[in-house]
Amino acid sequence: MTQDWDAGRLDSDLEGAAFDTLAVRAGQRRTPEGEHGEALFTTSSYVFRTAADAAARFAGEVPGNVYSRYTNPTVRTFEERIAALEGAEQAVATASGMSAILALVMSLCSSGDHVLVSRSVFGSTISLFDKYFKRFGIQVDYPPLSDLAAWEAACKPNTKLFFVESPSNPLAELVDIAALAEIAHAKGALLAVDNCFCTPALQQPLKLGADVVIHSATKYIDGQGRGMGGVVAGRGEQMKEVVGFLRTAGPTLSPFNAWLFLKGLETLRIRMQAHSASALALAEWLERQPGIERVYYAGLPSHPQHELARRQQSGFGAVVSFDVKGGRDAAWRFIDATRMVSITTNLGDTKTTIAHPATTSHGRLSPEDRARAGIGDSLIRVAVGLEDLDDLKADMARGLAAL
């Protein structure tokens, strides 16, 4: 027999709750079965009581699900939990991080609009703007991420959107989000921040003045390399446009992946703190090694934006990049000599990963575009996982010995 639960009942009143409580409980609704964990709704469609009920739901006259391309209870719980953690009015989940960017730009920009995108972004993001959005008549320029004067100078009367990663992939470059938001708003534009590297556990861009936050949930939100997904979170009328695009175009998140991400969120802050602590220790160790030319990690006092990172983030994240002496051949020898870390381009996993950005994530860019993004042949990116730090250092020492 089922228990006497109110279907759709919210888990509890969480107004004013702290981050860790929201990460565990926000958005959860129990079914009449009274389950304690989040229910997984693997259904494509929903049954209506009558023809009139179906018509009313499709017309939006009464609440309720009609089709999982539009809404799904498991996905909705994930969306509401992300919105609570980011301080957003609404969040909408997508099939991948790239589809989140697609939904954002296709929803908010039209042919003839102008978009400013940082040079310091993921290689596929550059390809999306350069190869595809330009086909639709959207103009794109790429100012340097941290040069606020360059952003202001690059604005045009038709500038609609600023898009940045902060910290950037893979060089951990930052922008003063509050200052950039002021410039964008003065020019009548919106600011979107890809918060993938920090997650809301370490940085909340909306509270700093950004209008929209983007995530690849595939990374630290999942945390264990299991599922793919993305999120757009924001405030105001722009989110209605994003929801409308996603319901029509269809790059929606699978319920199973939403359920995985809910499990990941429960340990998000704990994991990000552990990732950050190990990454900082590894960056400090690498900086002392003779085979390393430069380390890119905002937690290091030597990083040119260390103080900015301390001001707008509560931690420095898991990604440590560094240049080895000797160019591409040396970088490949370093990578191939490791025995524990995984050679893969994904990040955000409990397992440490290592990659050569110039020939993987940024490999499809022209040499000129890679140079503008600061991606050299000697660069290695390590996304620090949750293994023992001494074991990780020992594996990096194998790489150093191969130089």
From Swiss-Prot:
GO cellular component: cytoplasm
Function: Catalyzes the formation of L-homocysteine from O-succinyl-L-homoserine (OSHS) and hydrogen sulfide. Cannot use the other activated form of L-homoserine, O-acetyl-L-homoserine, as a substrate.
Cofactor: pyridoxal 5'-phosphate
Catalytic activity: O-succinyl-L-homoserine + hydrogen sulfide = L-homocysteine + succinate
GO molecular function: carbon-sulfur lyase activity; pyridoxal phosphate binding; transferase activity, transferring alkyl or aryl (other than methyl) groups
Pathway membership: Amino-acid biosynthesis; L-methionine biosynthesis via de novo pathway; L-homocysteine from O-succinyl-L-homoserine: step 1/1
Quaternary structure, from the entry: Homotetramer.
InterPro entries from the UniProt entry: Cys/Met-Metab_PyrdxlP-dep_enz (IPR000277), Cys_met_metab_PP (IPR054542), O-succ-hSer_sulfhydrylase (IPR006234), PyrdxlP-dep_Trfase (IPR015424), PyrdxlP-dep_Trfase_major (IPR015421), PyrdxlP-dep_Trfase_small (IPR015422)
Disulphide bridges: none
N6-(pyridoxal phosphate)lysine, modified sites: K219
Record keyword Lipid metabolism present: no
EC number: 2.5.1.-
Keyword tags: Amino-acid biosynthesis, Methionine biosynthesis, Pyridoxal phosphate, Transferase
Ranges in a coiled coil: none
Family: Belongs to the trans-sulfuration enzymes family. MetZ subfamily.
One GO term of the biological process aspect: homocysteine biosynthetic process
Source taxon at top rank: Bacteria
Keyword Transferase: yes
Protein name: O-succinylhomoserine sulfhydrylase
Pfam families tied to this protein: Cys_Met_Meta_PP
Signal sequence segment: none
